[in-house]
Amino acid sequence: MSETLATDATAPAEKKDFIRQIVREDLASGKHTVIRTRFPPEPNGYLHIGHAKAICLDFGLAAEFGGLCNLRLDDTNPAKEDPEFVVAIQDDVRWLGYEWAQLRHASDYFQVYYLAAQKLIRDGHAFVCDLSAEQVRQYRGTLTEPGRNSPFRERSVEENLELFARMRAGEFPDGARTLRAKIDMASGNINLRDPALYRIKHVEHQNTGNAWPIYPMYDFAHSLGDAVEGITHSLCTLEFEDHRPLYDWCVDKVDLAGHPELLQPLLDKGLPREAAKPRQIEFSRLNINYTVMSKRKLTALVEEQLVDGWDDPRMYTLQGLRRRGYTPAAMRLFVDRVGISKQNSLIDFSVLEGCLREDLDAAAPRRMAVIDPLKLVLTNLPEGHTETLQFSNHPKDESFGTREVPFARELWIEREDFAEVPPKGWKRLVPGGEIRLRGAGIARVDEVIKNADGEIVELRGWLDPESRPGMEGANRKVKGTIHWVSAVHAVEAEIRLYDRLFSVEKPDDESEGKTYRDYLNPESKRNVRGYVEPSAAMAAPEQAFQFERSGYFVADRRDHSAATPVFNRSVTLRDTWAK
């Protein structure tokens, strides 16, 4: 993809978090003329809502300051990576409203990393170690005890170069040797106790095939990847704060900007020379109650078939949230509301739901749908009577226009809108009582039809002919208004009533001997058959609506069609979880 300025989908008011303050100071001082950021996911799973914060920050920051943001796929662990995830990651970033300046892969730089490792060996900063993984752990020490030097730490430069070349040639089995940095085994930061830079892994890579039997470790590849691309501000979450000294060590000891010969493999590929020294800045990760965001746990939910796949609308993956009906605008608004800081906090799930309601209240056309149907027959209308009524598509925005809604003698109404024995304060239908049928007139129930089991199967009533739209009688006051659909014209639809996947605020809490599996909400999904007005059935997949008085729904992106409509409840009209 050609290099273009990153573009944000919105133009928010100036934000004053600490990261933006750093960027403003760097630009004002002339330290940087253009800022460069990157979003560097590993393609070993689907992105989740936590990644949305990083995406919006990385791409949004670049857009805000007229800079560039790369999408770099950190594909240094081929055993866990899959092209399926590569495609999904790009889809998610674009869905959120962002475009990358360049699409890069860590594997694009494998030869650069190899040359950089050779430089570290020549400079006396790296050595080939024969200790096993278990022995390395024993030598590393603890938080209170220093580590011990590897017996192979003082190998000569020549021997290290030869052994590293043989590692590269594939002569040794997996785990036989590693290349380690030579830093300080007594450091109080365990990350600096001679960490591994390369490991042997005879695994085919999705981009490079079997060309490499050795692969760089994350800290080494990540820091040099930023340096190669000239990233000015490398943004990551707080758990990488202790890794920053190693990040800086790798950048400084290799010094790509000062050793352009190391970049020759990129120039040979036609890539530009952009190397510079990046700065790592950490911010708090996104934590939301009623969720789990561990990739391991999300994978288990899918593999154990506790959910219906990675894009199950109850999942916290971006694919799942999208299918649920969450919008890019709502996701960006949520990230803005949460803000950027160094303080870890737990965000209430209702904040996310509130952002979706706020967006859809303004953006979603209104439609009528009946989820639990009960027939109402208006007996004073002629048999076969039908007519067409004009309805506004949005009560707050005339630009949405109007639509035609069929009306008939036989209607479907919500079963819960009728009570044979009403509770105190009831404002809907009762025997002999009146109700306003949305946009159609005032109706009364005269007769309740039941089956042999005593269940109500039909209501029979009367429509006041003087209360039709535009008539004086339409202004007569009645206690309540209900929605309806024409039984003759309505289209049967599958309606999936989704709710939160977990029933407790902290499903990760295992203090009582339970796991997140024990806290799955049995009411998180209910499939029902209902009826929608014809114009809703004709919607394109991913079209959102407010089903009046019911909630916000979206036409399922996978299963919906005009012939077999499927709607997912995105969020209720009001917070039903409020305490």
From Swiss-Prot:
Amino acids binding L-glutamine: D74, Y218
UniProt xrefs under SUPFAM superfamilies: Nucleotidylyl transferase, Ribosomal protein L25-like
Top-level taxon of origin: Bacteria
Keywords: Aminoacyl-tRNA synthetase, ATP-binding, Cytoplasm, Ligase, Nucleotide-binding, Protein biosynthesis
GO terms (BP aspect): glutaminyl-tRNA aminoacylation; glutamyl-tRNA aminoacylation
InterPro entries attached to this UniProt entry: aa-tRNA-synth_I_CS, Gln-tRNA-synth, Gln/Glu-tRNA_Ligase, Gln_tRNA_ligase_bac, Glu/Gln-tRNA-synth, Glu/Gln-tRNA-synth_Ib_cat-dom, Glu/Gln-tRNA-synth_Ib_codon-bd, Glu_tRNA_lig_a-bdl
HAMAP family, per the entry: Gln_tRNA_synth
Protein name, as recorded: Glutamine--tRNA ligase
Organism field: Xanthomonas euvesicatoria pv. vesicatoria (strain 85-10) (Xanthomonas campestris pv. vesicatoria)
Gene: glnS
